Amino acid sequence: MVVDIGTVTVAILAGSVALVVLRYIQARKPVSNYPPGPWGLPFLGSLLQFQTDHQRYFMKLGDKYGGVCSYMFGGKNVVILNGIESIKEALVTKGNDFADRPENYAVTLYNPQYLGLFDAHFNETWYNQRHFTHKTLRGFGFGKTSFESKIVEEVEFLIEYFKANQNKPVDIRNFITNCVANIICSITFGQRYDHFEDPAFLRAMNCIRDWFTAAGSLTLQMGHIFPFLKPFLGKQVGAVHEAAGKLESFLLAQIAKKQDSADATEEPRDFIESYLQQIKEDKEGKFSLLYLKQNIMDLFAAGTETTSTSLTWAVLYMMTHPDVQENVQKELDEVVGREKLPSYSNRGDCPYTEATLLELQRIISLVPVVPHATTCATTLRGYNLPANCEVWANLWSIHHDPKLYPQPEKFDPRRFLNEDGSLKKNESFMPFGAGRRVCMGESLAKMELFLFFTGMLSQFSFAIPEGTPPPSLEGDLSVTYMPKPFEVVIRERI
Ligand code: HEM
């Protein structure tokens, strides 16, 4: 029999194409009654339609396909949740089914075993670490009024810095980050650092933002979707290693110092000392130095960048909305006066100020999209989802839903106030997520936001530098939604 090479080649090609298309169809619809979503090309999925501010793009998908829809990132299938109903059903009503975290190439670069608090899978190890960390931090006053003085101490340092740098354009981001980081330092190492004097501290703290930016970059996501690209991502991989490595070395040095000076007879004075004691008492191998290091890494990453970026946004919104700034200052003057700094107990008497902070958190939606994964095969709003399904909850879509918040792009604190000026309760608000993986630092973050924000505004006003256009209110999305670099003129109120 004579075999025609041309026919064989065509047959092989046709077979390969059919296989690729079949695999694509299988990946596109892994189970029956799977959530709908845009069709795309085999191999590329719907990537050609992708837009970099994904939170807005995902909202558009929600408008077209509903609150539960699917999306193909190359060959990777993701379910996207938009709107309060689907996100609440997943994170709260069916909390256990949606409590896992997905695996990601960027995470393997700094946390290959998925340890710690944020990236960890939903299992007993995560539960033990989260439970012990939360209980111990609460014991040291984390999120309680007894911790207020530690925060106020840092507010006072920030005020000193503002006084020394007023009446000229300045970039305040690093200084805010350092003040906020010192709060986590107090609770984990029992020590604060001088912002100007300690180069190791400065290096470690200022790299947190670089770490978030590099780890959240679209380029590294591409490495996750198309593994063959990994050898070409040396620059981005190096940036993650460098930034995370600096923070890691700083934290390991703190742990080593504590190990050297550990005195078994003394009561632990901070989180590291408590954890080291727990390792000694633990007979089942549940606690180790490796877990300790990752837990502290997570506390610094999740607890520093988030609060400091929110406060940086707060300054940006105040300088661009002088009417709101004035209203807040007027309320603080009436309730507290300018002679002393506001305390957390004042917040009940400052509804406009509270409403401004809520509106800020709504409009920036600091962590716009939170990654979750299913722990088992489950259903959501009538659709079937397989186990280990990557699910992204678009919190931004709640906070920018025009039905819940008319004219969502408008910054208007009054939407959080009743007609009589009292604070309005709002069930459709979740900047800290919800359910089993809800932010562990929510109570601390709320206290920090109130004390820093009111401390800054009771003493200073913020303005756009003369002769320059208003800074952009559009941010850049990495893990968090960050403002673009900007300068502000700080003026002491007299
Ligand atoms: C304005 C400040 C903050 C915001 C907006 C914020 C927001 C969030 C969000 C949206 C999540 C994910 C929730 C989910 O997956 O459903 C999260 C998780 C987390 N946050 Fe925060 N956070 C803030 C401050 C803090 C602080 C101060 C700490 C600790 C000191 C902290 C520690 C954590 C931890 C450990 C997790 C992981 C929880 C887990 O997966 O079990 N956060 N945060």
What are these regions (language model features)?
Residues 1-6, 13-16, 274-277, 390, ...:
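C-terminal helix/juxtamembrane-tail motif
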Residues 2-114, 124-128, 152-160, 243, ...:
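N-terminal membrane-proximal hinge/A-helix region immediately C-terminal to the signal-anchor transmembrane segment
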Residues 34, 80-90, 96-99, 191-201, ...:
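Classical protein tyrosine phosphatase
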Residues 47-66, 249, 342-381, 402, ...:
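Conserved cytochrome P450 K-helix E-x-x-R motif and the immediately C-terminal K′/meander segment
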Residues 99, 322-324, 442-480:
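Cytochrome P450 heme-binding "Cys pocket" and the immediately downstream C-terminal segment
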Residues 101-110, 144-311, 327:
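Cytochrome P450 heme-thiolate monooxygenase catalytic core
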Residues 297, 302, 419-449, 474-476:
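Cytochrome P450 heme-thiolate "Cys pocket" and heme-binding signature region
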Residues 393-421:
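Conserved cytochrome P450 K-helix/beta-meander segment immediately N-terminal to the heme-binding cysteine loop
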